[in-house]
Amino acid sequence: MDNQGVIYSDLNLPPNPKRQQRKPKGNKNSILATEQEITYAELNLQKASQDFQGNDKTYHCKDLPSAPEKLIVGILGIICLILMASVVTIVVIPSTLIQRHNNSSLNTRTQKARHCGHCPEEWITYSNSCYYIGKERRTWEESLLACTSKNSSLLSIDNEEEMKFLSIISPSSWIGVFRNSSHHPWVTMNGLAFKHEIKDSDNAELNCAVLQVNRLKSAQCGSSIIYHCKHKL
């Protein structure tokens, strides 16, 4: 045995197919694990995105009114407009009509003071009568027509107190007293005899009466004298 030499040789055995397949097994498992992790991450991202979109829709839904709410709001708005228009119609139109009626009534009162118990504007009230104090000088007949156009008569004197009052207002004015001649009596516009004394009655040309400073006197009917009108209430 000592004489026999020990022979060392390298055995070149063919590779074992099973071992060759086992080596890549670890790599394959790691790849599969990585793929699973990626897939799981993608699923998580997708789920998170869906949750975010769902929450966003929820928030938007909370902020925006639904279709029935919009309809109700629109109906309420229309009702409010109708009510406002009705209020304006009820308040404005009657007030306008009332104002027109008042203006018409005022004109009627001014033209026909006897029917309402008040004197027209710019007239003076004294002892249940209205007096228009004229500033124009006219003849007796012109003064008579001017007072008639004002729904009144030429100034008449009922008593001494009224004469004093009128003398304070105006020193001189025509009165509604006349005569046909010096041989006829003095009469009023109603044809009644005038009882107060009239000065200068002897002059045949002076057939119309004038109030002058607390007394009555005769004057020519064609003279231009201030006139006053009287209207009994």
Swiss-Prot record:
Residues 1-70 are cytoplasmic. Changing residue 212 to A: Reduces binding to HLA-E. PANTHER family: C-TYPE LECTIN PROTEINS (PTHR22800), NKG2-A_NKG2-B TYPE II INTEGRAL MEMBRANE PROTEIN (PTHR22800:SF242). Induction: Up-regulated in memory CD8-positive alpha-beta T cell clones upon antigen-specific stimulation. GO terms for molecular function: carbohydrate binding; HLA-E specific inhibitory MHC class Ib receptor activity; inhibitory MHC class Ib receptor activity; MHC class I protein complex binding; transmembrane signaling receptor activity. This is NKG2-A/NKG2-B type II integral membrane protein. It comes from the Eukaryota. Heterodimer with KLRD1; disulfide-linked. KLRD1-KLRC1 heterodimer interacts with peptide-bound HLA-E-B2M heterotrimeric complex. Competes with KLRC2 for its interaction with HLA-E. Interacts (via ITIM) with INPP5D/SHIP-1 and INPPL1/SHIP-2 (via SH2 domain). The modification Phosphotyrosine is found at residues 8, 40. Residues 94-233 are extracellular. The keyword rRNA-binding does not apply. Immune inhibitory receptor involved in self-nonself discrimination. In complex with KLRD1 on cytotoxic and regulatory lymphocyte subsets, recognizes non-classical major histocompatibility (MHC) class Ib molecule HLA-E loaded with self-peptides derived from the signal sequence of classical MHC class Ia molecules. Enables cytotoxic cells to monitor the expression of MHC class I molecules in healthy cells and to tolerate self. InterPro entries: C-type_lectin-like, C-type_lectin-like/link_sf, CTDL_fold, NKG2/CD94_NK_receptors, NKR-like_CTLD. Glycans are attached at residues 102-103, 151, 180. Keywords: Adaptive immunity, Cell membrane, Disulfide bond, Glycoprotein, Host-virus interaction, Immunity, Innate immunity, Lectin, Membrane, Phosphoprotein, Receptor, Signal-anchor, Transmembrane, Transmembrane helix. Residues 118-231 form the C-type lectin domain. GO terms for cellular component: external side of plasma membrane; plasma membrane; receptor complex. Residues 1-29 are annotated as: Disordered. Changing residue 213 to A: Has no impact on the affinity for HLA-E.
